[in-house]
Every structure is written in C-alpha cells, then in structure tokens.
Amino acid sequence: MRHKLGQRKLGRTSSHRIALLRNMAAALIKHEQITTTLPKARELRPYLEKLITLGKKGGLSNRRLAHARLLDEAQEQKLFTTLAERYADRNGGYTRIIKAGYRASDAAPLAVIELVDRDTSAKGQDSGPVLTADEDEFEAA
C-alpha cells in the first residue's frame, strides 16, 4: 500500500520525474519565475528550497551535492553567489506559489512559482535566440 508516501508521481517514471525537477529548478533559478501546473509547482518547491539552503551553507561538499541535483554550471554559480547572498537572513520560505487559473486546452490548474524578493529583470533572460538589426534587414529583403 502507498500510505503516507511523500512525493507525487506526476504520471512519470522516477528518472523522468528527477529530470523534470532538475530542469524546472534550473529554469526557476535562471528566470526567477516560471508558470507550470500546480502539482509540478508543489513538487518543485521543497526540491528548490533544499538547493537554496545548500547554496547558503556554501562549501565544497554542498557545492558537489548541488551540482549532482542541478547539472547546470551557470545556475549552480548563481545559486552559490547571488541567491545565497539574497537569502542570507531568511530561514526558508524562498519561493511563492500563486494560482494562475486553468489551462484552456485541458483545464489543468496552473500556477506561477517564483522566488521571493526576485530580480524582475531576470524574467525572460536568455530565453532563446534574439534577432539583431542585421538579421531583421536580411529577413525583410
């Protein structure tokens, strides 16, 4: 029986679920706000809170643990520098989940998960290729 087991399966195998959490954690650290389904946001919250706590503690062993859970060098660096400094005086509660209605296609409940005291300029940062002025002129021709 599955009584009192802690995590949601999210309809995925264990390896798929771990990869999902890693990718979502990296995206949330990078953009500091993401929109996803409510169950995914609720699963991501404790995963990310533990990562931020590792970043606050610092040290080589904690950096290795974070690298094993995150697998993204740039976000790992941000975790141990920017976020560790930002949340130095906060004991937990680094994230906020805001319900955002329902998805039109399948009526899945949506939520916005964001870092508390987030940097609003980080939203959409490095989201993909950006056209330069030269490329715009080339496409117009």
UniProtKB/Swiss-Prot annotation:
Residues 120-141 are annotated as: Disordered. PROSITE patterns: RIBOSOMAL_L17. SUPFAM superfamilies: Prokaryotic ribosomal protein L17. Keywords: Ribonucleoprotein, Ribosomal protein. The keyword Kinase does not apply. One of its GO terms (cellular component) is cytosolic large ribosomal subunit. Pfam families: Ribosomal_L17. InterPro entries: Ribosomal_bL17, Ribosomal_bL17_CS, Ribosomal_bL17_sf. It comes from the Bacteria. The keyword Ribonucleoprotein applies. One of its GO terms (molecular function) is structural constituent of ribosome. GO terms for biological process: translation. Belongs to the bacterial ribosomal protein bL17 family. NCBIfam families: L17. Part of the 50S ribosomal subunit. Contacts protein L32. HAMAP family: Ribosomal_bL17. This is Large ribosomal subunit protein bL17. The lineage of its organism: Bacteria, Pseudomonadati, Pseudomonadota, Alphaproteobacteria, Sphingomonadales. The gene is rplQ.
